Amino acid sequence: MTPKKRKSKSKKNLRKTNWKKKASKQAIKALAVAKHVLASYNTAEATTN
């Protein structure tokens, strides 16, 4: 096998930052969903008591 050409640092950094942005967006969404679920659970508890 012949070694592949090296990608430039800037391209690597672009891919990394893009990946990090996507991960950050997903984390924020997951947190929002979790907060919503907890809030709805708490209101359901309050109405049953």
Swiss-Prot record:
Keywords: Chloroplast, Plastid, Ribonucleoprotein, Ribosomal protein. The keyword Plastid applies. One of its GO terms (molecular function) is structural constituent of ribosome. Residues 1-23 are annotated as: Disordered. HAMAP family: Ribosomal_bL32. One of its GO terms (cellular component) is chloroplast. It is found in: Plastid, Chloroplast. This is Large ribosomal subunit protein bL32c. The keyword Hydrolase does not apply. Belongs to the bacterial ribosomal protein bL32 family. GO terms for biological process: translation. Pfam families: Ribosomal_L32p.
